[in-house]
Amino acid sequence: MNVLVINCGSSSLKYQLINSDSEEVLAKGLCERIGIDGRLVYQKEGLDKEITEAPMPTHKEAIQMVLDALVNPKTGAVKSLAEIDAVGHRVVHGGEKFSDSVVITEEVIAQVEECNDLAPLHNPANIIGIRACQALMPNVPMVGVFDTAFHQTMPEKAYLYGLPYEYYEKYKVRRYGFHGTSHSFVSKEAASYLGMDLNNSKIIVAHLGNGASVSAVLNGKCVDTSMGLTPLEGLVMGTRSGDIDPSIMEFIAKKENLDIDGVMNVLNKKSGVAGMSGVSSDFRDLEAAYNEGNERAIAAVEVFSYRVAKYIGAYAAAMNGVDAIAFTAGIGENTSFVREKIMAYLGYLGIKIDRVTNDKTRGVEALISTADSSVKVCVIPTNEELAICRETVKLVG
Protein backbone atom coordinates (compact mmCIF):
# COMPACT_ATOMS: atom_id res chain seq x y z
CA MET A 1 0.00 0.00 0.00
CA ASN A 2 1.03 3.64 -0.47
CA VAL A 3 1.33 5.69 2.72
CA LEU A 4 1.62 9.48 2.78
CA VAL A 5 3.69 10.51 5.80
CA ILE A 6 3.08 14.04 7.07
CA ASN A 7 5.21 15.98 9.57
CA CYS A 8 3.46 19.28 10.14
CA GLY A 9 5.18 22.24 11.82
CA SER A 10 3.82 25.68 12.61
CA SER A 11 4.92 27.19 9.28
CA SER A 12 6.28 24.16 7.43
CA LEU A 13 5.30 20.67 6.36
CA LYS A 14 7.52 17.73 5.40
CA TYR A 15 6.09 14.80 3.47
CA GLN A 16 7.03 11.46 1.93
CA LEU A 17 4.97 9.04 -0.11
CA ILE A 18 6.20 5.52 0.67
CA ASN A 19 5.27 2.19 -0.87
CA SER A 20 5.01 0.02 2.23
CA ASP A 21 5.63 -3.25 0.37
CA SER A 22 9.01 -2.26 -1.09
CA GLU A 23 9.61 0.51 1.50
CA GLU A 24 10.63 2.69 -1.45
CA VAL A 25 10.16 6.46 -1.24
CA LEU A 26 8.06 7.36 -4.29
CA ALA A 27 8.22 11.12 -3.70
CA LYS A 28 9.21 13.54 -0.97
CA GLY A 29 9.53 17.21 -0.20
CA LEU A 30 8.42 20.05 1.98
CA CYS A 31 6.27 23.14 2.14
CA GLU A 32 7.90 26.21 3.68
CA ARG A 33 6.72 29.65 4.75
CA ILE A 34 3.10 28.57 5.18
CA GLY A 35 1.01 31.61 6.11
CA ILE A 36 3.58 33.94 4.51
CA ASP A 37 4.37 33.55 0.79
CA GLY A 38 4.66 29.79 0.40
CA ARG A 39 7.20 27.48 -1.23
CA LEU A 40 6.73 23.85 -2.30
CA VAL A 41 9.70 21.55 -2.81
CA TYR A 42 8.76 18.31 -4.60
CA GLN A 43 10.98 15.45 -5.74
CA LYS A 44 9.84 12.28 -7.41
CA GLU A 45 12.24 9.37 -6.94
CA GLY A 46 14.86 9.51 -9.70
CA LEU A 47 14.04 13.07 -10.81
CA ASP A 48 15.40 16.50 -9.89
CA LYS A 49 13.74 18.66 -7.25
CA GLU A 50 11.00 20.99 -8.39
CA ILE A 51 10.42 24.24 -6.53
CA THR A 52 7.12 26.11 -6.78
CA GLU A 53 6.58 29.53 -5.21
CA ALA A 54 2.87 30.01 -4.49
CA PRO A 55 0.68 31.48 -1.74
CA MET A 56 -0.11 29.06 1.09
CA PRO A 57 -2.37 31.01 3.48
CA THR A 58 -2.97 27.87 5.57
CA HIS A 59 -1.83 24.25 5.84
CA LYS A 60 -4.88 23.20 3.81
CA GLU A 61 -3.55 25.00 0.72
CA ALA A 62 -0.10 23.54 1.38
CA ILE A 63 -1.42 19.97 1.52
CA GLN A 64 -3.55 20.61 -1.57
CA MET A 65 -0.36 21.63 -3.42
CA VAL A 66 1.37 18.45 -2.21
CA LEU A 67 -1.52 16.30 -3.46
CA ASP A 68 -1.59 18.15 -6.79
CA ALA A 69 2.15 17.51 -7.21
CA LEU A 70 1.76 13.81 -6.36
CA VAL A 71 -0.83 13.32 -9.14
CA ASN A 72 0.76 15.66 -11.70
CA PRO A 73 0.47 13.88 -15.10
CA LYS A 74 4.15 14.53 -15.95
CA THR A 75 6.04 14.20 -12.68
CA GLY A 76 3.52 12.74 -10.23
CA ALA A 77 4.25 9.59 -8.26
CA VAL A 78 0.70 8.21 -8.57
CA LYS A 79 -2.05 8.49 -11.19
CA SER A 80 -4.78 9.54 -8.76
CA LEU A 81 -5.39 10.19 -5.07
CA ALA A 82 -7.19 6.84 -4.93
CA GLU A 83 -3.69 5.28 -4.92
CA ILE A 84 -2.93 6.87 -1.52
CA ASP A 85 -4.17 4.22 0.91
CA ALA A 86 -3.41 5.85 4.26
CA VAL A 87 -1.84 8.90 5.90
CA GLY A 88 0.57 8.67 8.84
CA HIS A 89 0.94 11.84 10.92
CA ARG A 90 3.78 12.67 13.26
CA VAL A 91 2.33 13.98 16.54
CA VAL A 92 4.87 15.39 18.97
CA HIS A 93 3.18 14.99 22.36
CA GLY A 94 0.75 12.29 23.42
CA GLY A 95 1.22 12.83 27.15
CA GLU A 96 0.27 9.81 29.25
CA LYS A 97 -2.74 9.13 27.04
CA PHE A 98 -0.91 7.41 24.19
CA SER A 99 1.61 4.62 24.66
CA ASP A 100 1.27 3.48 21.05
CA SER A 101 0.22 4.74 17.63
CA VAL A 102 -3.53 5.08 17.03
CA VAL A 103 -6.07 5.40 14.24
CA ILE A 104 -7.16 9.04 14.34
CA THR A 105 -10.74 9.72 15.44
CA GLU A 106 -12.45 12.82 16.82
CA GLU A 107 -11.83 11.44 20.31
CA VAL A 108 -8.11 11.06 19.58
CA ILE A 109 -7.90 14.65 18.27
CA ALA A 110 -9.62 15.91 21.43
CA GLN A 111 -7.11 13.99 23.58
CA VAL A 112 -4.17 15.39 21.58
CA GLU A 113 -5.58 18.89 22.10
CA GLU A 114 -5.56 18.23 25.86
CA CYS A 115 -1.77 17.83 25.56
CA ASN A 116 -1.31 21.20 23.82
CA ASP A 117 0.01 22.84 27.01
CA LEU A 118 2.86 20.32 26.99
CA ALA A 119 3.85 21.10 23.37
CA PRO A 120 2.37 24.51 22.50
CA LEU A 121 4.49 24.99 19.37
CA HIS A 122 4.05 21.51 17.90
CA ASN A 123 0.75 19.87 18.83
CA PRO A 124 -1.56 22.59 17.45
CA ALA A 125 0.37 22.45 14.14
CA ASN A 126 0.11 18.64 14.09
CA ILE A 127 -3.66 18.88 14.56
CA ILE A 128 -3.96 21.50 11.80
CA GLY A 129 -2.19 19.06 9.45
CA ILE A 130 -4.55 16.25 10.44
CA ARG A 131 -7.61 18.45 9.91
CA ALA A 132 -6.36 19.62 6.51
CA CYS A 133 -5.79 16.03 5.35
CA GLN A 134 -9.21 14.97 6.62
CA ALA A 135 -10.85 17.77 4.64
CA LEU A 136 -9.01 16.88 1.42
CA MET A 137 -9.03 13.07 1.81
CA PRO A 138 -12.14 12.34 3.90
CA ASN A 139 -12.24 8.60 3.17
CA VAL A 140 -8.55 7.82 3.71
CA PRO A 141 -7.61 6.31 7.12
CA MET A 142 -5.27 8.45 9.22
CA VAL A 143 -2.86 7.28 11.92
CA GLY A 144 -1.16 9.33 14.63
CA VAL A 145 2.40 8.33 15.62
CA PHE A 146 3.63 10.03 18.79
CA ASP A 147 7.18 11.18 19.61
CA THR A 148 6.47 10.44 23.27
CA ALA A 149 4.81 7.01 22.95
CA PHE A 150 7.94 4.81 23.01
CA HIS A 151 9.02 6.33 26.32
CA GLN A 152 5.73 5.54 28.08
CA THR A 153 7.24 2.25 29.30
CA MET A 154 9.58 4.17 31.65
CA PRO A 155 9.09 3.18 35.30
CA GLU A 156 7.90 5.77 37.82
CA LYS A 157 11.40 6.07 39.32
CA ALA A 158 12.65 7.31 35.93
CA TYR A 159 9.86 9.73 35.06
CA LEU A 160 8.97 11.42 38.37
CA TYR A 161 10.74 14.68 39.30
CA GLY A 162 11.74 15.65 42.83
CA LEU A 163 8.90 18.17 43.01
CA PRO A 164 5.71 18.31 45.11
CA TYR A 165 3.68 15.30 43.99
CA GLU A 166 0.61 17.49 43.50
CA TYR A 167 2.24 19.02 40.40
CA TYR A 168 2.25 15.59 38.82
CA GLU A 169 -1.33 14.94 39.92
CA LYS A 170 -2.68 18.32 38.79
CA TYR A 171 -0.53 19.19 35.79
CA LYS A 172 1.11 15.89 34.77
CA VAL A 173 4.59 17.36 35.30
CA ARG A 174 6.93 14.41 34.66
CA ARG A 175 9.55 13.16 32.22
CA TYR A 176 8.03 12.31 28.83
CA GLY A 177 11.00 12.18 26.46
CA PHE A 178 11.03 12.87 22.73
CA HIS A 179 12.51 11.44 19.51
CA GLY A 180 10.66 8.26 20.54
CA THR A 181 9.89 7.22 16.97
CA SER A 182 13.61 7.41 16.17
CA HIS A 183 14.71 5.64 19.38
CA SER A 184 12.23 2.83 18.72
CA PHE A 185 13.25 2.45 15.06
CA VAL A 186 16.99 2.55 15.75
CA SER A 187 16.90 0.12 18.69
CA LYS A 188 15.04 -2.43 16.53
CA GLU A 189 17.33 -1.88 13.54
CA ALA A 190 20.44 -2.13 15.74
CA ALA A 191 19.32 -5.44 17.24
CA SER A 192 18.59 -6.80 13.77
CA TYR A 193 21.87 -5.51 12.29
CA LEU A 194 23.93 -6.91 15.18
CA GLY A 195 22.10 -10.24 15.27
CA MET A 196 20.75 -9.68 18.76
CA ASP A 197 17.46 -10.76 20.27
CA LEU A 198 15.73 -7.42 20.91
CA ASN A 199 13.69 -8.99 23.72
CA ASN A 200 16.87 -10.00 25.54
CA SER A 201 19.10 -6.98 25.04
CA LYS A 202 20.44 -3.80 26.63
CA ILE A 203 20.79 -1.09 23.98
CA ILE A 204 21.63 2.60 24.40
CA VAL A 205 20.54 4.83 21.51
CA ALA A 206 22.26 8.20 21.05
CA HIS A 207 20.10 10.36 18.76
CA LEU A 208 22.50 13.23 18.14
CA GLY A 209 21.22 16.00 15.91
CA ASN A 210 20.41 19.68 16.42
CA GLY A 211 18.05 18.27 19.02
CA ALA A 212 19.74 15.41 20.86
CA SER A 213 18.72 12.71 23.31
CA VAL A 214 19.86 9.37 24.69
CA SER A 215 17.64 6.46 25.67
CA ALA A 216 18.09 3.22 27.59
CA VAL A 217 16.26 0.35 25.86
CA LEU A 218 15.98 -2.81 27.96
CA ASN A 219 14.54 -5.86 26.19
CA GLY A 220 12.99 -3.63 23.53
CA LYS A 221 11.34 -1.24 26.00
CA CYS A 222 12.48 2.25 26.94
CA VAL A 223 13.38 2.49 30.64
CA ASP A 224 14.89 6.00 30.65
CA THR A 225 15.59 8.91 28.33
CA SER A 226 17.39 12.24 28.64
CA MET A 227 14.71 14.71 27.49
CA GLY A 228 12.06 15.58 30.04
CA LEU A 229 8.75 17.40 30.28
CA THR A 230 10.02 19.32 27.24
CA PRO A 231 12.89 18.75 24.79
CA LEU A 232 15.05 21.21 26.76
CA GLU A 233 16.34 18.74 29.35
CA GLY A 234 19.34 16.46 28.96
CA LEU A 235 22.21 16.81 26.53
CA VAL A 236 23.77 20.07 25.38
CA MET A 237 22.22 20.56 21.92
CA GLY A 238 22.49 22.85 18.91
CA THR A 239 20.83 25.85 20.54
CA ARG A 240 19.36 24.31 23.74
CA SER A 241 21.19 24.34 27.05
CA GLY A 242 20.27 20.86 28.24
CA ASP A 243 20.63 20.20 31.99
CA ILE A 244 21.40 23.29 34.06
CA ASP A 245 21.02 24.39 37.68
CA PRO A 246 17.45 25.80 37.70
CA SER A 247 18.64 28.76 39.82
CA ILE A 248 20.59 30.01 36.80
CA MET A 249 17.25 31.15 35.36
CA GLU A 250 16.62 33.51 38.28
CA PHE A 251 20.25 34.68 38.28
CA ILE A 252 20.26 35.53 34.56
CA ALA A 253 16.77 37.08 34.70
CA LYS A 254 17.95 39.57 37.33
CA LYS A 255 21.27 40.33 35.66
CA GLU A 256 19.82 40.72 32.14
CA ASN A 257 16.43 42.15 33.21
CA LEU A 258 14.53 39.34 31.47
CA ASP A 259 11.08 37.94 32.10
CA ILE A 260 10.41 34.17 32.10
CA ASP A 261 9.77 34.15 28.32
CA GLY A 262 13.06 35.95 27.77
CA VAL A 263 14.99 33.44 29.87
CA MET A 264 13.30 30.49 28.12
CA ASN A 265 14.21 32.03 24.76
CA VAL A 266 17.86 32.11 25.84
CA LEU A 267 17.78 28.49 27.03
CA ASN A 268 15.99 27.19 23.92
CA LYS A 269 17.38 29.32 21.10
CA LYS A 270 20.62 31.02 22.16
CA SER A 271 22.39 28.34 24.17
CA GLY A 272 23.86 24.92 23.38
CA VAL A 273 26.94 24.60 21.21
CA ALA A 274 25.88 27.67 19.20
CA GLY A 275 25.79 29.87 22.29
CA MET A 276 28.95 28.39 23.75
CA SER A 277 31.02 28.57 20.57
CA GLY A 278 29.67 31.73 18.99
CA VAL A 279 30.23 29.86 15.71
CA SER A 280 27.20 27.75 14.79
CA SER A 281 24.84 24.99 15.85
CA ASP A 282 26.00 23.03 12.78
CA PHE A 283 28.72 20.52 13.64
CA ARG A 284 30.30 20.86 10.19
CA ASP A 285 31.07 24.50 11.02
CA LEU A 286 32.08 23.57 14.56
CA GLU A 287 34.46 20.87 13.35
CA ALA A 288 36.14 23.34 10.99
CA ALA A 289 36.50 25.90 13.80
CA TYR A 290 37.73 23.15 16.15
CA ASN A 291 40.43 22.15 13.67
CA GLU A 292 41.45 25.81 13.29
CA GLY A 293 42.05 25.98 17.05
CA ASN A 294 39.04 28.14 17.96
CA GLU A 295 39.03 27.80 21.76
CA ARG A 296 35.29 28.35 22.22
CA ALA A 297 34.48 25.82 19.50
CA ILE A 298 36.84 23.33 21.15
CA ALA A 299 35.13 23.89 24.51
CA ALA A 300 31.66 23.45 22.97
CA VAL A 301 32.60 20.16 21.29
CA GLU A 302 34.26 18.87 24.47
CA VAL A 303 31.24 19.75 26.63
CA PHE A 304 28.84 18.17 24.13
CA SER A 305 30.84 14.93 23.93
CA TYR A 306 31.39 14.73 27.69
CA ARG A 307 27.67 15.16 28.40
CA VAL A 308 26.72 12.38 25.96
CA ALA A 309 29.31 10.05 27.53
CA LYS A 310 27.95 10.81 31.02
CA TYR A 311 24.43 9.88 29.97
CA ILE A 312 25.61 6.67 28.30
CA GLY A 313 27.44 5.76 31.51
CA ALA A 314 24.34 6.52 33.57
CA TYR A 315 22.15 4.34 31.36
CA ALA A 316 24.65 1.47 31.47
CA ALA A 317 24.20 1.69 35.25
CA ALA A 318 20.40 1.95 34.97
CA MET A 319 20.28 -1.30 32.96
CA ASN A 320 23.10 -2.96 34.94
CA GLY A 321 25.12 -3.30 31.76
CA VAL A 322 24.96 -2.59 28.04
CA ASP A 323 25.22 -4.87 25.00
CA ALA A 324 25.21 -2.24 22.26
CA ILE A 325 25.38 1.51 21.65
CA ALA A 326 23.79 2.89 18.48
CA PHE A 327 24.61 6.35 17.14
CA THR A 328 22.02 8.02 14.92
CA ALA A 329 20.76 11.36 13.49
CA GLY A 330 22.82 14.10 11.83
CA ILE A 331 25.79 14.22 14.20
CA GLY A 332 25.59 10.61 15.33
CA GLU A 333 25.59 9.32 11.75
CA ASN A 334 28.08 11.72 10.16
CA THR A 335 30.52 13.22 12.68
CA SER A 336 33.13 10.56 13.36
CA PHE A 337 35.44 12.68 15.51
CA VAL A 338 32.59 13.35 17.98
CA ARG A 339 31.75 9.63 18.15
CA GLU A 340 35.40 8.91 18.90
CA LYS A 341 35.51 11.58 21.63
CA ILE A 342 32.41 10.13 23.29
CA MET A 343 33.72 6.57 23.16
CA ALA A 344 37.08 7.62 24.64
CA TYR A 345 35.31 8.13 27.99
CA LEU A 346 33.82 4.64 27.96
CA GLY A 347 36.85 2.38 27.96
CA TYR A 348 35.87 1.12 31.43
CA LEU A 349 32.92 -0.64 29.74
CA GLY A 350 35.40 -2.59 27.61
CA ILE A 351 34.59 -0.56 24.51
CA LYS A 352 37.21 -0.54 21.76
CA ILE A 353 36.69 1.54 18.62
CA ASP A 354 37.89 0.61 15.14
CA ARG A 355 39.23 4.04 14.22
CA VAL A 356 39.57 3.34 10.51
CA THR A 357 35.98 2.14 10.16
CA ASN A 358 34.69 4.94 12.39
CA ASP A 359 36.52 7.62 10.39
CA LYS A 360 35.03 6.53 7.07
CA THR A 361 31.47 5.86 8.29
CA ARG A 362 29.00 8.52 7.15
CA GLY A 363 25.24 7.95 7.11
CA VAL A 364 25.35 4.17 6.63
CA GLU A 365 24.88 1.17 8.90
CA ALA A 366 28.27 0.13 10.26
CA LEU A 367 29.87 -1.66 13.19
CA ILE A 368 32.52 0.77 14.45
CA SER A 369 33.80 -1.26 17.42
CA THR A 370 36.52 -3.91 17.17
CA ALA A 371 35.90 -7.65 17.26
CA ASP A 372 37.18 -7.85 20.85
CA SER A 373 35.13 -4.91 22.16
CA SER A 374 32.91 -5.93 25.11
CA VAL A 375 30.13 -3.67 23.82
CA LYS A 376 29.11 -3.47 20.18
CA VAL A 377 29.06 0.11 18.91
CA CYS A 378 27.31 0.87 15.64
CA VAL A 379 25.96 3.63 13.43
CA ILE A 380 22.32 3.15 12.42
CA PRO A 381 20.74 5.83 10.19
CA THR A 382 17.37 6.85 11.56
CA ASN A 383 14.31 6.91 9.32
CA GLU A 384 11.35 8.37 11.17
CA GLU A 385 9.22 8.55 8.03
CA LEU A 386 9.65 4.83 7.37
CA ALA A 387 8.90 4.14 11.04
CA ILE A 388 5.66 6.16 10.76
CA CYS A 389 4.81 4.28 7.55
CA ARG A 390 5.32 0.92 9.29
CA GLU A 391 3.19 1.98 12.25
CA THR A 392 0.44 3.13 9.89
CA VAL A 393 0.43 -0.17 7.99
CA LYS A 394 0.37 -2.08 11.29
CA LEU A 395 -2.90 -0.36 12.19
CA VAL A 396 -4.73 -0.02 8.87
CA GLY A 397 -2.87 -2.28 6.42
UniProtKB/Swiss-Prot annotation:
Its EC number is 2.7.2.1. It holds the Pfam family Acetate_kinase. The active site is at 147 (proton donor/acceptor). The record marks 179, 240 as: Transition state stabilizer. Substrate binds at residue 90. Its main location: cytoplasm. Mg(2+) binds at residues 7, 384. CDD domains: ASKHA_NBD_AcK_PK. One of its GO terms (molecular function) is ATP binding. One of its GO terms (cellular component) is cytoplasm. ATP binds at residues 14, 207-211, 282-284, 330-334. SUPFAM superfamilies: Actin-like ATPase domain (SSF53067). It catalyses: acetate + ATP = acetyl phosphate + ADP. It is found in: Cytoplasm. PANTHER family: ACETATE KINASE, ACETATE KINASE-RELATED. HAMAP family: Acetate_kinase. Catalyzes the formation of acetyl phosphate from acetate and ATP. Can also catalyze the reverse reaction. This is Acetate kinase. It comes from Agathobacter rectalis (strain ATCC 33656 / DSM 3377 / JCM 17463 / KCTC 5835 / VPI 0990). The lineage of its organism: Bacteria, Bacillati, Bacillota, Clostridia, Lachnospirales.
